[in-house]
A protein has these predicted regions:
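Extracellular adhesion/carbohydrate-binding repeat motifs centered on closely spaced tryptophans
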Residues: 1-266
Length: 266
């Protein structure tokens, strides 16, 4: 497939914003999409790693994808990419070894390049279309290859945990997670649930694992998420302050203590 401009010349090495090939441009109801014409004049498809210095993903209709994107390796070994945040989306990000999905975030419809090596805060795919500010958004970590970090099913560091909250001066259980995973990002430790969402506030790990010990951990507020160590003053829902201490090193790093520490009781 090629594309000719209004003079009839074949377009090469450029973006075009137009309707699908089978649609008339004067169709008032037609949807417009971005396409990229390679130096050969052919329309780009799949994953393209160096379009003006950026990586872009295209679906099987050659359309540039934006927002949440999912890749799946087919029987021919090629990866097919698709948008997963449209109006009818019910997609849940998760690690599924039987499907071998990979997930990406490609910004807005006028942007489209794959984000890499950075944090993003956004809605889950099924909630993205509405962009409802009353619906929770979550932090996700994007690896240097553009893939959203989602803990694998084989991750040896996955453990069950409970989300605790400090209310009226007491720690109470608010939610249960079948599995959480510890990951180091930019020299700091973070915990993620099975959907790749960064966790925050208090978590109680219910069992020992290879690199995690049972106990209470604290990760700061919802826009922080890094595991805390040492002395911390934390406010409850009434804004009353309470002091905690979390181990600073060794196999118990991050675990809250109960008892005497440096002549102080916690």
């Amino acid at each position: 497939t090629y594309y000719a401009d209004e003079t009839g010349a074949r377009v090469e090495g450029e973006w075009i914003y137009t309707v699908e090939p089978s649609t008339a441009e004067d169709d008032a109801d037609a949807d417009y999409y971005y396409y990229y014409l390679l130096s050969s004049g052919k329309v780009a498809s799949g994953k393209r790693n160096n379009i003006k210095g950026q990586t872009y993903l295209f679906d099987d209709q050659y359309r540039m994808l934006s927002g949440w994107v999912r890749g799946k390796v087919g029987s021919d070994g090629k990866t097919v990419y698709e948008s997963i945040d449209d109006e009818d989306s019910s997609v849940v990000i998760e690690s599924d070894s039987s499907e071998n999905y990979t997930y990406y975030y490609c910004g807005g419809s006028d942007d489209g390049h794959v984000k890499k090596d950075k944090w993003i805060k956004t809605w889950r795919p099924a909630d993205t279309y509405e962009e409802d500010e009353d619906v929770d958004q979550f932090w996700y970590w994007i690896e240097s290859d553009g893939k959203i970090f989602v803990p694998s099913n084989s991750d040896a560091d996955k453990v069950a945990a409970e989300k605790w909250k400090l209310e009226d001066g007491e720690l109470v259980i608010k939610a249960n997670y079948e599995s959480v995973t510890k990951k180091k990002v930019n020299s700091k430790d973070y915990f993620f649930n099975e959907n790749g969402e960064m966790l925050s506030e208090f978590l109680y790990v219910l069992e020992d694992s290879k690199d995690l010990k049972e106990g209470l951990y604290y990760f700061g507020g919802s826009d922080d998420g890094s595991m805390k160590t040492g002395a911390e003053t934390i406010k409850d829902d009434n804004l009353d302050s309470f002091k905690f201490y979390f181990e600073t090193k060794g196999e118990n790093k991050g675990v809250g203590i109960t008892g005497n520490k440096s002549n102080k009781l916690y």
